[in-house]
Amino acid sequence: MNFETVIGLEVHVELKTNSKIFSSAPAHFGAEPNTNTTVVDLGMPGVLPVLNKRAVEYGMKAAMAINCEIAEHTKFDRKNYFYPDNPKAYQISQFDKPIGEHGWIEIEVGGKKKKIGITRLHLEEDAGKNTHTSHGYSLVDINRQGTPLIEIVSEPDIRSAEEAYAYLEKLKSIIQYTGVSDVKMEEGSMRCDANISIRPIGQEAFGVKTELKNLNSFNNVRKGIEYEEKRQAEVLLSGGIIEQETRRFEEATGKTSLMRIKEGSDDYRYFPEPDLVDLFIDDAWKERIRAEIPELPDKRQIRYINDLGLPAYDAMVLTLTKEMSDFFEATLAARADAKQASNWLMGEVSAYLNAEQKELNETGLTPENLAGMIKLIEAGTISSKIAKKVFRELAQNGGDAEQVVKDKGLVQISDEGALRTIIGEILDNNEQSITDYKNGKDRAVGFLVGQVMKATKGQANPPMVNKLLLEEMNKR
């Protein structure tokens, strides 16, 4: 029997506000434990929440960016549960009236495009964080408690681990472009739970779903889904039944393990938050927020293809992160050729960032010095090979490309007389290569070009070397 996988993703994104959603405490990552707190975050008796308007507007902006309908009337609710990192014993969330509904985003997998529906986007507060020690007790940090979150719930439209990965990449990119979050999974500002079920191919009814947690990277989401597909199929094929449960992905083993039997919404005893009034959003407010949404990745891709003549693949890679795309735009503003800038950013720059585990803003590279280097290549001042040395110097130490070339003595040798002298010496010492060339062995030319480049420490003008080398050999 063959099965079809059905996946829905729940993505939590921390909003990049200065203060928390219901208190005046700072909402910044990395502070000393339990220092970013107020009596509201600690759940002290008698204190009242105050809604952060910026968090609401960030939620609206994110919802609009993923094509959601914005509610005219929304409200907050209490989600009741007890856990050490939740001092109030309830979480303020949104239950039946979320701020955004009925959205979608488009993904591409294997050259095929597909729309993934968004059920809802709602606002809520984050919980604190427990750190479990090896000494039999846990440490509780309330800093994260009350940080504003949006939860984005997809429709069960995803059919594979690859589609889930593509969905998360696209969602991250869109949210990053809006500026409402930095969406850094390593800092917990983007987190994902996956609801996974399988069903026989052709069956309309959904199977029993498993909720998968502890997915702290996109790769782990993919691995967790792939394992669950296999596990659930083995259970059904052996005559067993799938239990509705919450499971944890174990990164060390690549497997999942039982955490608890899955709760339903009734277990949380939702009821309207009595300390917050309902929120009404008029058209003028919506339009003001809509006007703040920048050009999103899909539209930017189309512009790169149509206006700049870039291949679709280049446009997709360049727009995957806002940082890279903005850097590319600024490099063009510094009058660099679009295709050359694209090639450098997708090639040497990306390779350097991956190897050094850095972001662009953590290097000495700027749009101006990258554009300057590209202009030096186009002018014939440096070769592409020398440009790699210049690039590394700029990335490590910054500065001006032209000045680096002068200081390091990297100017390309394009003087015909100087090159003929060097070529003459090379040919005098490699008469066998001349004979091989005249006998039709083209490899001899490559060898001699290499000798010239070696003698000039890579600074000879390659096209000129090829031209002059052939001329000099044909004279002999």
UniProtKB/Swiss-Prot annotation:
EC code: 6.3.5.-
InterPro entries (UniProt xref): Asn/Gln-tRNA_amidoTrfase_suB/E, Asn/Gln-tRNA_Trfase_suB/E_cat, Asn/Gln_amidotransferase, Asn/Gln_tRNA_amidoTrase-B-like, GatB, GatB_C_1, GatB_Yqey_C_2, Gln-tRNA_amidoTrfase_suB_CS
Enzyme class: ligase
Molecular function terms, GO-annotated: asparaginyl-tRNA synthase (glutamine-hydrolyzing) activity; ATP binding; glutaminyl-tRNA synthase (glutamine-hydrolyzing) activity
Alphabetized UniProt keyword annotations: ATP-binding, Ligase, Nucleotide-binding, Protein biosynthesis
Catalytic activity, as annotated: L-glutamyl-tRNA(Gln) + L-glutamine + ATP + H2O = L-glutaminyl-tRNA(Gln) + L-glutamate + ADP + phosphate + H(+); L-aspartyl-tRNA(Asn) + L-glutamine + ATP + H2O = L-asparaginyl-tRNA(Asn) + L-glutamate + ADP + phosphate + 2 H(+)
Entry's Gene Ontology BP terms: glutaminyl-tRNAGln biosynthesis via transamidation; translation
Pfam families: GatB_N (PF02934), GatB_Yqey (PF02637)
SUPFAM superfamilies reported for this sequence: GatB/YqeY motif, Glutamine synthetase/guanido kinase
Subunit text: Heterotrimer of A, B and C subunits.
HAMAP family: GatB
Function according to Swiss-Prot or TrEMBL: Allows the formation of correctly charged Asn-tRNA(Asn) or Gln-tRNA(Gln) through the transamidation of misacylated Asp-tRNA(Asn) or Glu-tRNA(Gln) in organisms which lack either or both of asparaginyl-tRNA or glutaminyl-tRNA synthetases. The reaction takes place in the presence of glutamine and ATP through an activated phospho-Asp-tRNA(Asn) or phospho-Glu-tRNA(Gln).
Name of the protein described by the UniProt record: Aspartyl/glutamyl-tRNA(Asn/Gln) amidotransferase subunit B
Species in which this protein is naturally found: Listeria welshimeri serovar 6b (strain ATCC 35897 / DSM 20650 / CCUG 15529 / CIP 8149 / NCTC 11857 / SLCC 5334 / V8)
Gene: gatB
